Every structure is written in C-alpha cells, then in structure tokens.
Amino acid sequence: MPAINRFASLGYAIPGAVIAVGVLVPLGRLDNLLAGWLEQALGTKTGLLLTGTVAALVYAYLVRLLAVALQTVDAGLAKITPSMDDAARSLGTSPIQTLARVHAPLLAPSLAAAALLVFVDVLKELPATFALRPFNFDTLAIEAYNLAKDERLAEAAAPSLVIVAVGLLAVLFVTKRYFQATRS
C-alpha cells in the first residue's frame, strides 16, 4: 500500500497544467483512433469524442486528487484491526454483515472527510479545469479568474468568497472531527 500511496501522491505534486497536457495527449490520440475507426465503419465523421468533455475533466481530477482521498481513507482503514474481523467472525457474522456493522461505521467519517476535501479541491482547481473544460462549462474558479482578468474585481469577489467559505467550512469540519477523535 505505501507504493500505491507514493504513486498516487505524484498527481498532487505535479502542476494542474502538466496533468491537463498529460490527459489531453492520450485522449487526443484515442479520439483520432475512434474517429478513424468510426469513419471507416460507419462512414461518418465524428470529430473529437472525449477531448473537451466532462469525462476528460473527471479523469484529470481523479489523477490530480487521488492522493487526497487515498490518504484520508487510508487513515480510516488504519482504525480497523484484524482482531475486529476475528471478533465479528466469532460472533457468527457473515463478511457482508461485518462490512455493514463494523467497517462501514468506522470508515464513514473518513469517507465523508475525503469527499469533502476532494470537493473543495475540485472547486478551486483552475489550471486543469481551464485546459480541459467543455465550452460554456465555467466553474467558480474559472468565473473568478475571468472576472479578475477583465479587472472586474468587485464582481470577482463573489465567486472567490464562495470558494473561500466552502474551503473554510471544510477545514472547520475536518478540524472538529480531528479533535473529537483525539478526545475519545
């Protein structure tokens, strides 16, 4: 598992623009292969099918933010010990019941924190979103950037403030969870 964590953390260490290019190149080649095959098989020109779609954007987010989610969930998995599984098995529970009654309640806070942290990172991600977004698909970060670029700073304040407020709420939630866990 440490090797997977180290490999996944590369996405967070590499700039978003580099990840965007790293996603665009293979998707462009795949688009060209699909377009050639569809033109040969069906006789229609399709153009780009994957590049500039939400699927490409989600893939870039997955590469970029896997480390955030993986480390948070890994911390939750550390709470589950083999003795818990042994105890559940000795009480006659099936593996599915053990998952539902033991693992899921212990992992729920970590999964919620991971989802929240990834949501906040997606909300503020600009370089990969800017390069890979479909036309007329503006996130808060892109809207704030476009308004600030046009020197409409008063208008750029609203989307920027929403990004900061959501980030602050996430930090407060995770901090509260951390202090509750250390007290118990």
Stretches found by the model and what they are:
Residues 2, 15, 51-55, 85, ...:
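Residues that define the loop-to-transmembrane-helix transition and helix capping
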Residues 3-4, 20-62, 96, 132-135:
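Membrane-interfacial helix termini and adjacent extracytoplasmic/periplasmic loops
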Residues 7-14, 27, 58-66, 116-123, ...:
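Hydrophobic transmembrane alpha-helices
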Residues 10, 14, 63, 70-73, ...:
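Transmembrane alpha-helices
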Residues 20-32, 36, 75, 109, ...:
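Juxtamembrane/transmembrane-helix interface segments of polytopic membrane transporters
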Residues 47-89, 114-115:
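Membrane-cytosol interface at the C-terminal ends of specific transmembrane alpha-helices
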Residues 74-89, 93, 97-101, 116-117, ...:
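C-terminal transmembrane helix and the adjacent membrane-cytosol boundary/short C-terminal tail
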Residues 123, 129-172:
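Interhelical loop and adjacent transmembrane-helix boundary motif
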